[in-house]
Amino acid sequence: MRQVAIYGKGGIGKSTTTQNTVAALAESGKKVMVVGCDPKADSTRLLLHGLNQKTVLDTLRDEGDDIELESILKTGFGETRCVESGGPEPGVGCAGRGIITSINMLEQLGAYTDDLDYVFYDVLGDVVCGGFAMPIREGKAREIYIVASGELMALYAANNIAKGIKKYAETGGVRLGGIICNSRKADNEYALVKAVAEEIGTQMIHFVPRDNIVQRAEINKMTVIDFDPAANQANEYRKLAKAIDENQMFVVPKPMTQDRLEELMMKHGFLDAV
């Protein structure tokens, strides 16, 4: 069983990318569980065709500790197993703690069965705060992929996340598997993201082009694989899934300084030198 965490800045398309990749893996016959680690609880919506799944934390609040696995785990597209950890009430408590509680509960209830090929953790976070780092800190997720684009803040967040991974890689077995570029059609985006990936010692594992079919599929509460399996974009997600499935490059990242990141941006024509 490979345990994979997907990180990236808010709004970069982590949940969409994760669900489409998982759908492609499921289509190819892999058995996959997705654990949403975001208080928005939207990490499994497309796999479940819009079902507003009750989160682990809400279930615990309503029913106490004596809950059944069926109460928190739903089956989605391609027999994927879908869980949302949820979060505390706004302004109260730490969402990261919710992730810890949820994963512990899933372990207690026997969700991590031997027949699973993958568990994906879709994790909120521009910065790897202690709670949100839990899937890597506790050694649950062994491989990390960062979703980024060719925009400064996305790459700044990716570099920050690499710092967090480096910290935990030194004491545990977690490794960075690569950067997924979720294109925003920025100038020189492919070359820039590839250069940033290489600078921190990893690879751009796939460049996902921008395509409006992703939004059309989302409006219909589906992944692209489900909505239009013959679409070019569906094939892009299949390529990403295959790249992850066959990946052999797992590294301890070498994060950049802020100055070096800005140097790379300038080199690729993003920031005008003052």
Curated annotation (Swiss-Prot):
Reaction catalysis annotation: N2 + 8 reduced [2Fe-2S]-[ferredoxin] + 16 ATP + 16 H2O = H2 + 8 oxidized [2Fe-2S]-[ferredoxin] + 2 NH4(+) + 16 ADP + 16 phosphate + 6 H(+)
Cofactor note: Binds 1 [4Fe-4S] cluster per dimer.
Positions of modified residues (ADP-ribosylarginine): 97
UniProt GO BP: nitrogen fixation
Annotated residues for binding of [4Fe-4S] cluster: 94, 129
SUPFAM superfamilies: P-loop containing nucleoside triphosphate hydrolases (SSF52540)
Gene3D superfamilies for this protein: P-loop containing nucleotide triphosphate hydrolases
Cofactor(s), by name: [4Fe-4S] cluster
Post-translational modification: The reversible ADP-ribosylation of Arg-97 inactivates the nitrogenase reductase and regulates nitrogenase activity.
Keywords from the named record: 4Fe-4S, ADP-ribosylation, ATP-binding, Iron, Iron-sulfur, Metal-binding, Nitrogen fixation, Nucleotide-binding, Oxidoreductase
Top-level lineage group: Archaea
Similarity comment: family membership: Belongs to the NifH/BchL/ChlL family.
HAMAP family: NifH (MF_00533)
Name used for this protein in its record: Nitrogenase iron protein
Gene name for this UniProt entry: nifH
